[in-house]
Amino acid sequence: MLALEAAQLDGPHLSCLYPEGVFYDLDSCKPFSYPDSDGGLDSTWGWTEAPPAPAIAPYEAFDPATAAFSHSQTVQLCYSHGPNPSTYSPMGTLDPAPSLEAPGPGLQVYPPEDFTSQTLGSLAYAPYPSPVLSEEEDIMLDSPALEVSDSESDEALLAGSEGRGSEAGARKKLRLYQFLLGLLLRGDMRECVWWVEPGAGVFQFSSKHKELLARRWGQQKGNRKRMTYQKLARALRNYAKTGEIRKVKRKLTYQFDSALLPASRHV
């Protein structure tokens, strides 16, 4: 039993004295245990007593064959849906946390692939398709270079170069006026071209067989395209610039330069 002695505060005008007989018994302050509904004492009131030691399970050998592992549980938190959703609110609605293993709506679940066991085979490349050549281009690759072109501009170029004597060292090419003069002197293809005035070098084409003569000239040159009299006539008009052949004012009629004619043909 402890007794609290009276204490007096020092001071000139104030003094306080505890009433006598005020004693506190520590045993009376021991909490009272109320029985619970089952008749036993409530364990929460036995705070002065030491808690019982937990029972320790006996040690068992670990067997990896029988051990089963379970996935870790995802902790779900509750957040408020108010102005500040980052603050915790015990009154908020519990929203399930998204799981990385469960697929979302509309997503397909694909089985896991083992990339380490895959082997890369040889890459198959499709062969580059070779360009398809037309019949004309195929002939162009296999045929030798043409000596004479069928354009009138080339005829004029050849005529000018021959007139200046620039064919030295180069292979001589058959020109149109040489081809026509040879036919007339030999008398070949008389149904296509003939002499009108042999001494003056005037000759005329047949209106009926002029295309046949033009095709013969194209074959002589080795052209791939079909030669026509229209192309041949353009080449003849270009000779007027160099003087080998000029046009006469008659239908389908032309005249050689006198320098090209043999001496027996001069008047």
Curated annotation (Swiss-Prot):
Region (TAD2): 41-62
GO molecular function: DNA-binding transcription activator activity, RNA polymerase II-specific; DNA-binding transcription factor activity; RNA polymerase II cis-regulatory region sequence-specific DNA binding
Stretch forming the signal peptide: none
Compartmental location: Nucleus
GO cellular component: a single term: transcription regulator complex
Keywords, comma-separated and alphabetical: Activator, DNA-binding, Nucleus, Transcription, Transcription regulation
Pfam families reported in the protein's UniProt record: Ets
Tissues and organs where the protein is expressed, per its UniProt entry: Expressed in the medulla of the thymus, the spleen and germinal centers of the lymph nodes. Expressed in B-cells and T-cells, expression increases during B-cell maturation and decreases during T-cell maturation.
DNA-binding region: 174-257
Domain notes: The protein contains a weakly acidic N-terminal transactivation domain (TAD) followed by a second TAD rich in proline, serine and threonine. Each of these domains may be required for transcriptional activation of a subset of target genes.
Function: Sequence specific transcriptional activator which binds to the PU-box, a purine-rich DNA sequence (5'-GAGGAA-3') that can act as a lymphoid-specific enhancer. Promotes development of plasmacytoid dendritic cells (pDCs), also known as type 2 DC precursors (pre-DC2) or natural interferon (IFN)-producing cells. These cells have the capacity to produce large amounts of interferon and block viral replication. Required for B-cell receptor (BCR) signaling, which is necessary for normal B-cell development and antigenic stimulation.
Complex formation: Can form homotypic interactions. Interacts with IRF4/Pip. Interacts with JUN. Interacts with TBP. May also interact with CREBBP and EP300. Interacts with NONO/p54(nrb).
Record-stated family: Belongs to the ETS family.
This protein's name: Transcription factor Spi-B
Organism: Mus musculus
Lineage, opening ranks: Eukaryota, Metazoa, Chordata, Craniata, Vertebrata
